Amino acid sequence: MSLTINALTRDDQGKGASHRLRRNHKIPAIVYGTGKAPRNITLDVFEITRLLENEESYTSVLDLIVDKKKEAVIIKDLQRHPAKNIVTHVDFLRINLKQAIVTSVPLHFNGEENNEAMRLGAILNQFVTSVEVSCLPTDLPHAIDVDISNLTMGEHISFTGLNIPKGVVITALTHGDIETHNRSVVAIQEPRKIAEIEEETSIIVEDENIESNNADKNKSNS
């Protein structure tokens, strides 16, 4: 089932126009790409809010219907109110279904509850929560699953260890030397003992006290 969002062409621009739109439960947006001129449009705030409640909308090809004409797009950028978390502006990118696109896809970490090392107190460190990919729009995954259930103490998963769907490429691994760009995504690490942390903290405090005393002596000597 395709996801659809309706819009109207917008002629009014500027802060005043945007305020008037929002008073009427509308928000400004723009659609651009595929060599066509950018187009200012208006969205219904309730409709776009409902659409964004579906996580797949962020990584899906959407049917944008502007003045009853349909275009294939993806969401390229979102702006939200800093306090109310309400969407205030949307950028849509037109796409050609036969040409590859570059966009970010979230990583979903699974198997934490079945990981033996974590049951014994190991710590899960997630270094990356999304990854930039290149693929045809029809091959775009909604998310990439990362299974950590069998990850043992000291082990990690990097870009090359991800289970990437057919037709999808991680863009970082296309830039020359793979090892240089092969980032760690997640790792299982041994928790530091409380005594070790307390000892390190004590050393830091002692060093600070020594520096403070030396500074006081220098002041008195001068």
Swiss-Prot record:
State what this protein does. Answer: This is one of the proteins that binds to the 5S RNA in the ribosome where it forms part of the central protuberance.
> Mind telling me what this protein is named?
Large ribosomal subunit protein bL25
User: Could you list the residue ranges that cross the membrane?
Assistant: none
Molecular function GO labels: 5S rRNA binding; structural constituent of ribosome
Question: InterPro entries annotated for this entry?
Answer: Rbsml_bL25/Gln-tRNA_synth_N, Ribosomal_bL25/Gln-tRNA_synth, Ribosomal_bL25_b-dom, Ribosomal_bL25_C, Ribosomal_bL25_long, Ribosomal_bL25_short, Ribosomal_L25_dom, Ribosomal_uL5_bac-type
Question: Keywords of this protein's UniProt record, alphabetized?
Answer: Ribonucleoprotein, Ribosomal protein, RNA-binding, rRNA-binding
Provide the gene name from the record: rplY
Kindly indicate whether the keyword Ribosomal protein belongs to this entry. yes
Q: SUPFAM superfamilies in the record, alphabetically?
A: Ribosomal protein L25-like
Can the keyword Oxidoreductase be found in this entry's annotation? Answer: no
Q: State the source organism's domain of life.
A: Bacteria
Q: How does it assemble?
A: Part of the 50S ribosomal subunit; part of the 5S rRNA/L5/L18/L25 subcomplex. Contacts the 5S rRNA. Binds to the 5S rRNA independently of L5 and L18.
